[in-house]
């Protein structure tokens, strides 16, 4: 008898397999209503030689110097190759962020989909690997390392990236993970490593270094304070900072934005309209052209492929509000693109990663209810094609988004960002009309 069940979420059908429940390991962090399989290192099969004391051989054939944790026990790093290890990789953050009220647990179904080599379009042109760190048989850290040939071709560089870094507060563990990532890239001929970046800067990136006391917003990173020390004590140095800004309904912010946008818009015939969801694929094709042109010269940017952009757009459509996805045209020519998302971390945070419990869509019901109660947003994308800048396009985007979000949807505030630290034009404009820089994220690099 088939015990699987299915649920529908905004047009998507999700199959929920019913599986036996294994026993939980010592010190495991459990999600509500579940137990986890034992966390252990792969055993050495009969006839195989165990790794030497001074080095660790992972299953990709790479030799990594073995370090010790602060407790004097050796750290072992292994590449993820099985479904069980992938589950451990996805669920490990629950150990790091237990008790952190500002962390937003990802939906497990989405976290697994992001790493699916068969379905995520990044793997059509790039490659990546996942690593887990173990001490005394327990998972104590994780890291993603990726190689994007498109980025190197666009910028004339020879780099790879690391991301999804999580570690207990232990330099031996962190260094072991970073060593494994660097060695993986060296084997592919790369000579520089940059991060934290999950595949590319089109996805979550940056290490939080300022602003730990406010909630994690949608599609942004969150991490403990000690991560910066772990990365810097390895040998990573600052490449650039990213700023996140806070806009709220205090004072006369809307009035100031309105005056600025109106004055600048008089310089040209600018039209701002919502993207038509009824003609979604055609509209997304227009937006992709603008997106890639607007950010082409930005630090760290790599053009998204058609498949990547459509994949991401369809994912975000589940949560997006049509009047907050905007396309600008100047004399009929696409000139800019802006996306403000409801901060659905507000809706998902109470679910602790689960849409289902014991096969029942309890989390899904809560999610649909919570989505109607969201009070903040995040302006995640705002780009203007270079020849149309200084015509009020960006200012009109921000004004329209604030007006609809605050006046129509009842939002009390919104995050804008990220922006590059050296983008003086946009940073000064945001400050001038009352925006407050409230978070800073750092990207690091090192020769390898």
Residue ranges with predicted function:
Residues 76-88, 272-286:
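A short beta-loop-alpha structural element at the N-terminal edge
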Residues 86, 149-152, 201-203, 252, ...:
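Flexible loop/turn segments at secondary-structure boundaries
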